[in-house]
Curated annotation (Swiss-Prot):
Keyword annotations of the record: Ribonucleoprotein, Ribosomal protein
Underlying gene: rplM
Family designation: Belongs to the universal ribosomal protein uL13 family.
Gene3D superfamilies with a match to the protein in the record: Ribosomal protein L13
Task performed by this protein: This protein is one of the early assembly proteins of the 50S ribosomal subunit, although it is not seen to bind rRNA by itself. It is important during the early stages of 50S assembly.
The protein, known as: Large ribosomal subunit protein uL13
GO biological process: negative regulation of translation; translation
InterPro entries recorded: Ribosomal_uL13 (IPR005822), Ribosomal_uL13_bac-type (IPR005823), Ribosomal_uL13_CS (IPR023563), Ribosomal_uL13_sf (IPR036899)
Protein species of origin: Carboxydothermus hydrogenoformans (strain ATCC BAA-161 / DSM 6008 / Z-2901)
């Protein structure tokens, strides 16, 4: 009888990938990043093991939101005090802090447990063109 292959954490080879978000919808870039972080693009994907790669997202400020999401979609946070709910439209958030918009989108697409928190640490988002990870020799991910 054959058994399903289960990857072990020390057997996994990790690569670095760069995703250019310029002119692409935020959600599509975020879903590709989540797929790479989980390792679902690899044949040795194992759901309960970190088999994913490192992901660098550049040009976060040049990403687009389709439809009327810039005005209608809101970013919520709460101070945990009564009346402490803050609501910021994504149009303002993308101008002031596009990195936070990408991090929130990708984090929502990862598992909501210890593994997801570990995977999220392998995501690096930068608003501009440059990034400090040239020494890792990242590959460009096209989709």
């Amino acid at each position: 009888m054959r058994t399903t292959y289960m990857a072990k954490p020390n057997e996994v080879e990790r690569k670095w990938y760069v995703i250019d978000a310029a002119g692409k919808p935020l959600g599509r870039v975020a879903s590709e990043a989540a797929k790479l972080l989980r390792g679902k693009h690899k044949p040795e994907f194992t759901p309960h093991v970190d088999t994913g790669d490192f992901v660098i997202i550049i040009n976060a400020e040049k990403a687009v939101l389709t439809g009327k999401k810039l005005e209608k979609k809101m970013f919520y946070r709460h101070s945990r005090y009564p009346g402490g709910l803050k609501a910021i439209p994504y149009g303002i958030l993308m101008k002031t802090n596009p990195v936070l918009a990408f991090e929130k989108a990708v984090k929502g697409m990862l598992p909501h447990n210890r593994l997801g928190r570990k995977l999220f640490k392998k995501l690096k988002v930068y608003a501009g063109e440059s990034h400090p990870h040239q020494a890792q020799k990242p590959e460009i991910w096209q989709f």
